[in-house]
């Protein structure tokens, strides 16, 4: 095997745990809720802190790779990822797990741009580079697709920390391989890092998400929630002004003035919001309501994961044949149809219908993602292709984080409003049971059998009602977005084969 392909193999090995870690916790949510005694709000932070931190860190980490060389960045990111995985596996509380997940995101934000830079540096010939990038994309989509299944297998046989602990030996092996196989690159000391701007962006995102969660759950005083929101908005405003005035901005904000690029960003964020939010919702319903094990839940969700992970080539062919506008709008419409159908589906008695709709959802989301990439890269000037790609990466990560937050908030709000609590619960118990189905499960274990059974029946009924409302709401919003996308992409020319 040539040195080039050995380098690629080493790079892909370190990317595998990063890709899996993006989705591995989806089926672990119910287990974490019980094992750590985490509230519904803490559970959402455990899962979405990874994507939200990564969204703000991936751009400056790319600049750090240019400054110190991608090999050093790859090794440093792998070491941080391994240490954070060990900390996460041994976390005694929800707060320490949230902090460990944030550190995991920092390591992942180093690894992802380092792997891409490594491929660009290793393969000078375009055909070989495209093949290498295709393999990289396959590892990313495949890892994310099978992450919940891997998590289910581990949780079936080991304790919850195993979903993180498995990363440690993998990281040790890939560090040794990369240190030996990957060639060293010259450093570019003049490359700016913009680390302060990245930290401000992360703080702004977290403060805005925190204030939104607090406002919906009513956990903080209104004035304090408003103060946090204003602080986040002020930081975001400062960040945007800094980007507009900088000679070499971290994010080229002027690209957002292009209607087609803005449409592409909206499609990318929406596709990830719906896909990741749906997977989290499904994982909880399958385990809490339908009593499936984590592995069984992972198997049940396999159609949407496989379809979304491996439909890219088909979607690319459709864009070439039908046109960007048609595929983008069609993807949104099919996603809306899937959500509206799933909102009316009984997962316990209509499994084949659920799997069919989930497969359609996965394919339509993949089509929307491919269309978003095509829109962004086709509309961006050549000299700003890298900046446009960076914006797309941020849109993916923000979409994943916001999907968990938005679906989780709407689900929690609807569940709390619709649960009909049985008699025999104190005020504190009633408040706990109404906060989330995970809290209801924890509480039921300490109640008399009759009251516990009545509570779980009420909790399951409320969750199913909330699930239907969330999916129906997502379906309606996607219909509205499809109309907007059809209008905004009206100026995009059809390919010759479609004429």
Summary of predicted features, one role per range:
Residues 32-33, 64-65, 150-158, 212, ...:
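Interfacial helix-cap and linker-helix signal at transmembrane-aqueous boundaries
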Residues 4-20, 25-27, 40, 196, ...:
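12-transmembrane solute porter fold
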Residues 34, 84-89, 104, 178, ...:
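MFS-fold secondary transporters
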Residues 48-62, 112-116, 302-314:
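Central cavity-lining transmembrane alpha-helices of secondary-active solute carriers
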Residues 134, 156-268, 274, 281, ...:
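Hydrophobic transmembrane-helix bundles of small-molecule transporters
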Residues 63-196:
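Helix-loop-helix hairpins in multi-pass membrane proteins, especially solute transporters
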Residues 28-56, 290, 295-296:
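Extracellular/periplasmic helix-loop-helix junction of adjacent transmembrane segments
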Residues 37, 69, 90-96, 158-159, ...:
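Helix-breaking motifs and short loop linkers at transmembrane-helix boundaries and internal kinks
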